[in-house]
């Protein structure tokens, strides 16, 4: 938790963020952890956290407005590097970057299935923003759902006639584990609609 707070604090101060979008469930957990942290800091010093306005997106659904529809800005978002060897660096991703890459990557209107987290670049860009640009669709679910029931991934691909899906290497290995994915759950699967399946985001093992 402390490591996560340190990353949030660094990014907020580096880019000057004022607002954080989240969900009610996450915000409750975050506030509880902060309360525990304040109690523990009575006996030990703790670094101050930056002030943010937290907006729960659950509460603003259905309240769409046209106020920003005609406002454009070349910067779409800042994508921070992992920071494994130094402080994370905010890389500017422009509207033009996204549109160009989407059209260079996809040759059809995609039907995507993904359990990748939305905060990960492969999940965010490849399975939420690319379909948006190309007029496609995405059927997404939580990585936790995949870990609990990996058959859900393959069954969803089969049911919605998905054309694109991706996973880190461990996801494919996970599906090869008969204890996690019994052969009985593979019956009736039809993955012939897939045009693109990518293994990326971590070292690819040839034996997989």
Please report, for each region that a protein language model flagged, where it lies by residue.
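Structural core segment of the AMP-binding/adenylate-forming
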Residues: 1-63, 168-169, 174
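Conserved acidic residues
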Residues: 9, 18, 110, 163, ...
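Short hydrophobic/charged patches on amphipathic alpha-helices used for structural packing
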Residues: 9, 13, 67, 150-154, ...
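Adenylate-forming
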Residues: 22-32, 162-208
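Conserved AMP-binding/adenylation subdomain of ANL enzymes
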Residues: 99-111, 121-164, 173-183
């Amino acid at each position: 938790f402390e490591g996560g707070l340190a990353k949030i604090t660094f990014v907020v101060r580096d880019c000057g963020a004022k607002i954080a979008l989240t969900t009610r469930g996450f915000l409750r957990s975050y506030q509880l952890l902060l309360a525990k942290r304040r109690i523990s800091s009575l006996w030990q010093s703790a670094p101050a956290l930056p002030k943010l306005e937290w907006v729960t997106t659950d509460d603003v659904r259905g309240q769409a407005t046209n106020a920003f529809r005609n406002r454009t800005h070349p910067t779409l978002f800042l994508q921070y590097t992992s920071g494994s060897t130094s402080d994370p660096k905010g890389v500017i991703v422009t509207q033009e970057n996204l549109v160009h890459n989407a059209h260079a990557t996809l040759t059809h209107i995609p039907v995507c299935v993904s359990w990748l987290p939305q905060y990960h670049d492969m999940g965010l860009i490849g399975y939420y923003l690319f379909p948006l640009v190309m007029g496609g669709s995405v059927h997404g679910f939580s990585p936790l759902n995949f870990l609990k029931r990996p058959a859900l991934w393959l069954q969803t691909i089969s049911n919605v006639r998905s054309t694109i899906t991706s996973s880190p290497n461990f996801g494919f290995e996970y599906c090869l584990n008969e204890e996690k994915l019994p052969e009985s759950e593979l019956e009736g699967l039809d993955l012939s609609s897939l045009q693109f399946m990518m293994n990326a985001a971590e070292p690819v093992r040839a034996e997989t």
